[in-house]
Structure formats: C-alpha cells, structure tokens
Amino acid sequence: MTCEKERFIWLNGDIVKVSKAKINVLAPTAQFGANVFEGIRCYWNEAKQQLYAFRLKEHYQRLYNSAKLFRMKCPYSMEELECFMKETVKANGYREDIAVRQTLFVDGFGSWFSTEPVGMFIAPI
C-alpha cells in the first residue's frame, strides 16, 4: 500500500492542505472557465540543495498580460507572487524537479462577463 504525503497549496493568502482547499462551484471560474495560469518549472540542484525557478519574471509578466486580456486585475505584485510561491514550495518540502501552477480566477458569484473578485491559487505539481 502506498501512503502519499499530504500536499499543500496557497489559496487566497493561506497555505492549506489540498484536501481542504475549496472554490465555489458556482463561481465564474467553475461555471465558465474564467481563469488564467502560468506553469513554472523549478529544478533541484543536488550540490546546492536548492530549487531554482526557471525564468520567473517572464512567467509573471505573461500571467499579468493574460489577466489584462481577460480584464482581471492581479491583486499581487511580482515580488509578492515570488514570496508566495517560495512559501508554498517550502511547505511541501520538495527536493526534486517540479512544476508550479499559478492560477488567477474569478471567484464569488457572477456571469460569463464577471472579472472580479479575483482569487488565486499556487499549486506545486
């Protein structure tokens, strides 16, 4: 029998267990796919015992550009996003190459045209 370790994600300002993360099923993100995301590769350096994110600033700029096209406002600075990603990766204790999905989504109740409130999750996968 395989016993998987509980994973953590960052959701709207809090690091939570994946099994406890909740998004409203009637939110525009669930009803209409109202979200934008970036997948960021991180590479483990065994000699330095460190994970390194690949082209982080470029990924964040694309995330901002995607949100702008969708008329969503990212409520966080690039520096905050980097800090949140580091916190989330550390909470999981990864010592291997990983990908980190960072997703901005339209939360709450709304229609196809809703652009707020904007929620976010960061999920190492």
Question: Language-model segments: what does each one mean?
Answer:
Residues 1-125:
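Conserved alpha/beta cores of soluble small-molecule-handling proteins
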